[in-house]
């Protein structure tokens, strides 16, 4: 079916699906009221079309008046349907039709109009009318998998009942009510989709895209048989009875046979591609695998990986299934794959890569595998023989009726295994057996319903059963207590119980496809008894006389037990077994230590247990289906001889238990709280520290959600942390923990630091919780201290700024007037002493002004408020300008300033003004503390490690280490040694503000450089400033 949108996507919309299920005529139009986007069968019929395809994507020619009426109601911005009466058709045939018009949103968000009306014929067949062709098949399926209505060729697809049940379950679990995947039809799989239309009662729309098998197409084109087909056959059979049996065999031999598979042991390794969906279902596999292991063995598309692994026997530790759940890349996983038609299995290595959509939606895995036929090994379970379609060719059929009856149970179990490997394959033509295998509605072709014919056959079965038991006592049973066919049967039973309990089995109304075989005269089959009919004595005569314990049951419901079972278990009657608990009370599959047993254990009425071997058959019982379970006690000869290994295992187990106890003790001793969480987010257990931390008893918190341990404002953060780890995202790699607020049992709150890790085997989590109350208290104290220090610093800066403003104004007046008076511009000063006083006033004023400026600069640096403009600065040029400014003062002091600048010195990243100020401060101190005749040497260099270094060396008086420490403190001056004075008898070290070196060091560090000073008394001082490579603009 054509169209811009898949038919089933629109049929599953909430505004469409219920009307579709009722059989309403529905039409989805674009807003131009001409383009038909979607229509169902009744809707196409309403406008005169027989098929949906004839109208979808076409132009609908509505009358102008009808368009106007629909457009008037569709302009309302509401999704509620509006009723409108219009006339459809033309001339005398026009009819008044009541339509319901509503606005809907298509799957891609495009707005459209839904036009619908009720139709007289609301049957299921009418709902899907106009749909389906040679390559498209439509069906309506109810809640139990029954096909309510279908397109003509749907039955030819041969979809099994179990497949329909799986599709119904998946559609019910889907959030958008649609499941799209490949669906198994007969021996192949084709693309299809199923949508859940209604919930009460449940009704599903199933769409399949694919041609029916060729052998069924011919049958579909043939004329159906009339109702009196049986009478016609009775007339034809005598006429053909004279033909010899060789003619029938010749006819069968002349039919074309499918090409058989032959395993090539010497073939080179083959590489194949495979894909699975988000649920682990195989969606694609390349034919390279089938070329090595056989087509039946590689026909796994549409099946879950866990199911295939369970049937093929390579589900050992579940590691691959766990990797499929983790959604991460993996490789190097090895398993053994059975080879069709052989007793071999070949090693296969698998690797996979997760696939995501653009919206990071997980789409499944895409991987490759390598199969190595040259390394094939023997398969103890011989699964490959079952995949080949039955008994190997070198086995001769047994013609004796008794032998055939004895092997029926095993053949039936084999048929169950074959159904898993090759679902619904046509059965081979076999001679008529002494047991009548009658088809029953609700069962697939591979299920066998056995009805016993006569007392003679019953006696033969009993004799052969007794003979079989004697031979079994002498034979050595395989490992695990079960034969390969029995083990395959149990796998199939587990598969079916997983999908749907046998207690809820039902009879389906569809008639199974008959097997292809030559026509032979048959004896009339006794009618099947209904449940209401009383049990006939001959129906249970064989079972009652058997010496083997037998149970007839369906799921947990027990229908019949024989006397041998009552004798071995110690129960008086069947009612006693039912009242004690039924099937569950009879069997125990776990040992005392909780480990799963390899064989079944029968529990007696007194509580004692006995190992038994089991044999399972599918039989007809009271007109329905049931399972017959026969038990064979395991004798002492069958049990393995005691060895020294169990003793060693006991010692190892005791050591392991002691180690576990030690670990528990360590966890309880730890001061941090440890909480174990299951995959659903519930608390499994906690140690003593966690119990004391939150005030909960261990058993009180177990089973409750992990979020109960946190305050409301931290619950979301804690659960997001947990979900982030389960999704294999960034948190699973960068797990840095979380700070949360815990909630005590009494309502108090605790600050906690939480770290969660994943547990590898249980898929759970482990949370470690640490009480950080003391950390928070210390952090709060440090925060308060920092705030107090910042407040004091701001107060000091504010005070200095205010004092500076108050001092600058009178200082400027004093300095200005003193300079004016010293210049005698308004008249001479009669006395030279007054001139000296004026010079002292001017010098003192400038000194105080420099002090105020230095105070402001150092306060700004300490507060981080100094305005600095970082740019490329030429260090040589900055120092050269400072030398030029200090040269007059050095000449007056008779101090020589020498410079040594490295050529091609790279620029540095610094504040130009502060670099000049640093150079001036260092040169000023060097000139001031150097005696006349001394030298000051300024140099720059570019080191090999990328550093740029500035050095200022003088030959002055120098300082000791204690004096250097004192000089680097603000407002501290060196008041020391007498005798080191200038020629004017004035101690130059008592001059200054005491801020020169501290301010210089602060400016250097503000420019991200390093400040160092080295001085010795009487030898001079060296100041070194290093700019690291990160502050150097090298070429």
From Swiss-Prot:
Record's function text: Functions as a polar differentiation marker. Essential protein that, by localizing in the old pole of dividing cells, controls cell division and maturation, probably through control of DivK phosphorylation status and cellular distribution, which in turn regulates CtrA, a transcriptional regulator of the minB operon. The asymmetrical localization of this protein is probably required for cells to enter a new division cycle.
Ranges where the Histidine kinase domain occurs: 802-1031
NCBIfam families on file: histid_kinase_PdhS (NF041593), sensory_box (TIGR00229)
Complex formation: Interacts with DivK.
Encoding gene per record: pdhS
Region (Important for polar localization): 1-613
Leading EC class: transferase
Compartments (UniProt record): Cytoplasm
SUPFAM superfamilies: ATPase domain of HSP90 chaperone/DNA topoisomerase II/histidine kinase, Homodimeric domain of signal transducing histidine kinase, PYP-like sensor domain (PAS domain)
Gene3D superfamilies assigned to the protein according to its UniProt record, in alphabetical order: 1.10.287.130, Histidine kinase-like ATPase, C-terminal domain (3.30.565.10), PAS domain (3.30.450.20)
Protein name, UniProt field: Cell-division control histidine kinase PdhS
């Amino acid at each position: 079916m054509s169209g811009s949108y898949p038919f089933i996507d629109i049929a599953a919309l909430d505004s469409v699906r219920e009307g579709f299920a009722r059989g309403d005529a529905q039409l989805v139009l674009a807003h131009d009221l001409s383009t038909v986007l979607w229509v169902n069968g009744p809707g196409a019929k309403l406008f005169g079309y027989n098929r949906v395809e004839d109208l979808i994507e076409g132009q609908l020619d509505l009358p102008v008046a009808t368009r106007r009426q629909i457009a008037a109601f569709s302009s309302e911005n509401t999704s509620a349907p509006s009723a409108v009466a219009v006339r459809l058709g033309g001339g005398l045939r026009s009819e008044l039709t009541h339509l319901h018009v509503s606005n809907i949103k298509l799957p891609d968000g495009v707005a459209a109009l839904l036009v619908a009306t009720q139709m007289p014929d609301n049957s299921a067949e009418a709902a899907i009318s106009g749909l389906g062709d040679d390559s498209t098949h439509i069906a309506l399926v109810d809640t139990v998998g029954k096909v309510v209505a279908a397109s003509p060729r749907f039955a030819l697809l041969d979809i099994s009942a179990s497949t329909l049940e799986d599709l119904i379950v998946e559609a019910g679990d889907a959030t958008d009510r649609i499941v799209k995947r490949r669906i198994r039809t007969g021996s192949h799989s084709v693309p299809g989709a199923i949508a859940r239309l209604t919930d009460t009662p449940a009704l599903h729309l199933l769409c399949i895209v694919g041609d029916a098998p060729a052998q069924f197409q011919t049958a579909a084109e043939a004329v159906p048989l009339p109702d009196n087909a049986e009478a016609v056959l009775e007339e034809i059979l005598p006429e053909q009875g004279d033909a010899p049996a060789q003619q029938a065999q010749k006819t069968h031999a002349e039919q074309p046979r499918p090409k058989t598979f032959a395993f090539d042991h010497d073939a080179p390794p083959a590489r194949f591609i495979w894909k699975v969906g988000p649920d682990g279902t195989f969606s694609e596999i390349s034919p390279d695998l089938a070329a090595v292991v056989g087509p039946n063995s590689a026909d796994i598309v549409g099946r879950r990986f866990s199911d295939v692994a369970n049937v093929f026997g390579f589900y050992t530790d579940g590691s691959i299934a766990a990797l499929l759940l983790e959604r991460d890349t993996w490789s190097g996983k090895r398993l053994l794959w059975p080879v069709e038609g052989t007793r071999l299995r070949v090693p296969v290595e698998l690797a996979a890569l997760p696939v995501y959509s653009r919206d990071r939606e997980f789409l499944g895995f895409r991987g490759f595998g390598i199969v190595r036929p040259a390394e094939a090994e023997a398969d103890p379970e011989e699964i490959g023989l079952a995949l080949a379609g039955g008994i190997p060719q070198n086995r001769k059929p047994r013609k004796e009726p008794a032998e055939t009856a004895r092997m029926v149970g095993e053949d039936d179990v084999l048929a169950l295994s074959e159904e898993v490997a090759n679902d619904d394959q046509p059965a081979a033509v076999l001679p008529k057996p002494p047991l009548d295998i009658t088809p029953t509605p609700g069962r697939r072709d591979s299920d066998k319903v056995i009805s016993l014919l006569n007392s003679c056959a019953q006696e033969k079965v009993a004799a052969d059963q007794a003979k079989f038991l004697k031979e079994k006592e002498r034979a050595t049973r395989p490992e695990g207590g079960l034969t390969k066919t029995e083990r395959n049967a149990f796998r199939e039973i587990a598969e079916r119980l997983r999908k749907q309990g046998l207690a809820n089995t039902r009879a389906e109304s569809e008639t199974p496809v008959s097997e292809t075989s030559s026509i032979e005269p048959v004896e009339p089959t006794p009618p099947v008894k209904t449940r209401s009919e009383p049990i006939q004595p001959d129906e249970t005569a064989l079972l009652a006389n058997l010496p083997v314990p037998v149970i007839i049951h369906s799921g947990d419901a027990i229908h019949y037990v024989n006397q041998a079972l009552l004798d071995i278990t110690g129960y008086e009657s069947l009612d006693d077994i039912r009242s004690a608990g039924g099937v569950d009370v009879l069997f125990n599959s776990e040992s005392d230590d909780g480990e799963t047993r390899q064989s079944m254990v029968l529990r007696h009425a007194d509580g004692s247990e006995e190992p038994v071997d089991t044999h399972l058959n599918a039989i007809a019982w009271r007109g329905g289906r049931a399972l017959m379970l026969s038990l064979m006690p395991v004798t002492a000869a069958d049990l393995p001889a005691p060895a020294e290994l169990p003793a060693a295992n006991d010692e190892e187990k005791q050591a392991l238990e002691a180690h576990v106890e030690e670990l528990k003790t360590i966890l309880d001793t730890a001061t941090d709280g440890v909480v174990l969480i299951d995959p659903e987010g519930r608390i499994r257990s906690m140690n003593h520290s966690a119990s004391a931390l939150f005030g909960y008893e261990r058993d009180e918190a177990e089973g409750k959600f992990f979020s109960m341990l946190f305050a409301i404002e931290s619950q979301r953060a804690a659960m997001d942390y947990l979900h982030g780890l389960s999704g294999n995202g960034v948190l699973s790699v960068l797990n840095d923990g979380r700070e949360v607020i815990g909630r005590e049992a009494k309502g108090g709150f605790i600050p906690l630091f939480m770290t969660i890790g994943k547990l590898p085997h249980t898929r759970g989590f482990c949370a470690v919780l640490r009480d950080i109350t003391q950390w928070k208290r210390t952090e709060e104290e440090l925060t308060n201290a920092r705030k107090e220090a910042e407040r004091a610093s701001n107060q000091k800066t504010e005070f200095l700024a205010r004092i500076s403003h108050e001092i600058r104004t009178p200082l400027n007046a004093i300095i200005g007037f003193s300079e004016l008076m010293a210049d005698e511009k308004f008249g001479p000063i009669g006395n030279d002493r007054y001139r000296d006083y004026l010079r002292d006033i001017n010098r003192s004023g400038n000194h105080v002004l420099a002090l105020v400026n230095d105070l402001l600069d150092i306060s700004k640096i300490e507060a981080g408020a100094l305005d600095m403009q970082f740019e490329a600065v030429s260090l040589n040029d900055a120092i050269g300008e400072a030398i030029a400014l200090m040269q007059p003062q050095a000449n007056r002091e008779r101090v020589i300033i020498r410079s040594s600048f490295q050529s091609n010195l790279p620029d540095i990243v610094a504040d130009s003004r502060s670099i000049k100020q640093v150079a001036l401060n260092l040169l000023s101190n060097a000139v001031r503390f150097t005696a006349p005749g001394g030298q000051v040497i300024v140099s720059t260099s570019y080191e090999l490690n990328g550093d740029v270094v500035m050095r200022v060396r003088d030959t002055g008086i120098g300082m000791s280490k204690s004096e250097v420490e004192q000089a680097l403190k603000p407002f501290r001056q060196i008041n020391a040694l007498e005798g080191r004075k200038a020629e004017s008898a004035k101690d130059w070290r008592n001059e200054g503000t005491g801020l020169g070196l501290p301010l210089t060091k602060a400016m250097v560090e503000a420019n991200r450089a390093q400040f160092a000073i080295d001085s010795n008394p009487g030898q001079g001082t060296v100041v070194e400033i290093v700019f690291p490579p990160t502050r150097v603009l090298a070429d």
